[in-house]
Amino acid sequence: MRSHILGKIELDQTRLAPDLAYLAAVPTVEEEYDEFSNGFWKHVPLWNASGDSEDRLYRDLKDAAAQPTAHVEHVPYLKEIVTTVFDGTHLQMARSRNLKNAIVIPHRDFVELDREVDRYFRTFMVLEDSPLAFHSNEDTVIHMRPGEIWFLDAATVHSAVNFSEISRQSLCVDFAFDGPFDEKEIFADATLYAPGSTPDLPERRPFTAEHRRRILSLGQVIERENFRDILFLLSKVHYKYDVHPSETYDWLIEISKQAGDEKMVVKAEQIRDFAVEARALSERFSLTSW
């Protein structure tokens, strides 16, 4: 796992509370890449390429600065964090995120953009604790704690889940560089850069051949009508068992083959490629159209 803690700030709960209340009240709309999730998944753009409050698409900024949206003036504490904790020179986007009773399927980000993936640098900070909310990055599952500033290696296979209805609002701030860089360059105050903290990594159970056999037995019940549901079910397995999240797609393809439905096999292969291999900017994928 390359994801790691960069530092930590003490969140002022009194100042944070009205910001979180405002973000919670922003209407939920269909998200970019909404097919990656089920349940409640919400992004509120604070800085983006256009300054448009409805623009949720991440895209490369070259020779241009990220623009604040109208939401920024309603979240003064988060505005202060973004502008004083971070150096805005290479800022691409800043947004709040929330996930409740939902999972984001394993995927890779930045595959639709122009820079080398190592030039993108995503930070993630949980703003409120949700004990059943987790991230995964390659072979590791993480429970992020409020105030921890994480580098989230979104260029590798990763996922997120919240097994509860307890809100888990967070702040995601993205940077991009044109050449080699030091990760501490993202901070306005170099003293905030304090890597090396011990993360909270939940223990997972061993994954055995018997577990795999049981998963593949879903080939007896999968249909086009529940294909999407089974994908999201499979995406949760690696949070409880010590298995790589990309196995989700290997299982889905094998289960589809057992069903004897060639269109289902093709769709399983296509969602794998769309999620972790390559896709065009703004390209969408349907899990329910056949």
Swiss-Prot record:
GO terms for molecular function: metal ion binding; proline 3-hydroxylase activity. Its cofactor is Fe(2+). Optimum temperature is 40 degrees Celsius. Is stable below 40 degrees Celsius. Fe cation binds at residues 107, 109, 158. It is an enzyme of class 1 (oxidoreductase). 2-oxoglutarate binds at residue 168. It comes from the Bacteria. Its EC number is 1.14.11.28. Optimum pH is 6.0. Is stable from pH 5.5 to 9.0. Inhibited by metal ions such as Co(2+), Zn(2+), Ni(2+) or Cu(2+). Is also inhibited by EDTA in vitro. Keywords: Dioxygenase, Iron, Metal-binding, Oxidoreductase. Binds 1 Fe(2+) ion. It catalyses: L-proline + 2-oxoglutarate + O2 = cis-3-hydroxy-L-proline + succinate + CO2. Homodimer. Dioxygenase that catalyzes the 2-oxoglutarate-dependent selective hydroxylation of free L-proline to cis-3-hydroxy-L-proline (cis-3-Hyp). Belongs to the L-proline cis-4-/cis-3-hydroxylase family. This is L-proline cis-3-hydroxylase 2.
